[in-house]
Curated annotation (Swiss-Prot):
SUPFAM superfamilies: P-loop containing nucleoside triphosphate hydrolases. Pfam families: PapZ_C, RapZ-like_N. The lineage of its organism: Bacteria, Pseudomonadati, Pseudomonadota, Alphaproteobacteria, Rhodospirillales. Belongs to the RapZ-like family. Residues 1-34 are annotated as: Disordered. It comes from Rhodospirillum rubrum (strain ATCC 11170 / ATH 1.1.1 / DSM 467 / LMG 4362 / NCIMB 8255 / S1). Keywords: ATP-binding, GTP-binding, Nucleotide-binding. This is Nucleotide-binding protein Rru_A3448.
Amino acid sequence: MGRSASLLRLRDPAPLPTDIAPDPAEAPPSPAADRRVIVVTGMSGAGRTTVLRALEDIGYEAVDNLPLSLFEALTQGRWDQPRPLVLGIDTRTRGFHAATVLAAIERLVAATGFDVRLLFIDCDDEVLVRRYTETRRRHPLAVDRPLADGIALERALVAPLKERASRCLDTSILPPAKLRAVIEAEFSLDHRPELAIFVSSFGFRNGLPREADLVFDVRFLANPHYEPHLREMTGLDPAVAAYVAADPDFAPLIDRVTALLALLVPRYEKEGKSYLTIAIGCTGGKHRSVYTAERLAAWLNETGRRAHVRHRDLKETPR
C-alpha cells in the first residue's frame, strides 16, 4: 500500500437510498459532536504512553490497548461525543496485526466519515536499547530473546503502520517534557496549534543537535573557560552571565538574532510549522551558549510566545 499524507480517507460513506427514511439511531451526529479520532501506535519505549497522557490532559478521551474487536464497535450507532477520541494500539494489543489495524481504520472511515489519523511514535534502536537498559523494563517482544532482537522484530511488525501514518514523530532526541510540549502545541483543541519553540544550548565538541532548525555559533565571544574563577561555573551563574554580556560583540549579536527571529517566527507560524528548535553553540556548551540561550528564550517569552529552554550538555532539567 502507498503512503498517504492524510490517512485512509478512501471514500465518503455511501448515501442512503432516497426512498428509505433514515433510522433515527443512525442519524448524523449532532453539530457539537467531535468526529476526530487519533490512533497512536509505534515502537515500545518510544513514548507512546507519554503522548496518550499529553493528549488526555488537553481534552482528548483516551483509551489504551483497546482490543481490535472492540475497535470495530466504533463503526456502530450514533457518534455524539463532544471530545475527540485517541486510541492507543501496540503489539501488546489483543489481536494485533498491522493489516488488521489498517483494515479496521478503513472500515471506520468508510462507515462513519470520521477524520481518522494515525500517529506513529518512533525512536532510534540504540536509544530504545539504552532506555530499556536504564529502566530495567522488559521489552514486550524480548521475553525469550535478546533485547535488540525484540526491537528488530517489533519494527518489522509495525512497519506497515509507519508507512501509512499521517504523522511520524521521532522521539530519539525529545525528553518527555519536550515531547509533551510538541503534542500540546500540535494537537491543541482550544485554538489553532501554536508554534512550540525550543532554545537549546550545546557544545560543538559533542556534535550538532540533530533536531536543530536554526543554529547559531557564539564561539567568537570571549570564553569564560579561560578565567580561573569562572571555569567551574556555567552560563546560569550571574558572574558568567555578566562576563558574557560585557563582551562588546554580545549586544550586537542579540540584536541581530532577535531581529532575524522577529522576521522568521511569524512566518513559521503562518505556514503551520508545529515546532521550532533554535540551537546555540559554543565550544563545550557550558558558558557562552547557555547564557545566550537564556537571553533568547527570555526575549521570545516577552513577545508573548512560549519558549522552552534546554541545555543539552549541562545536567539540567528542560523547562
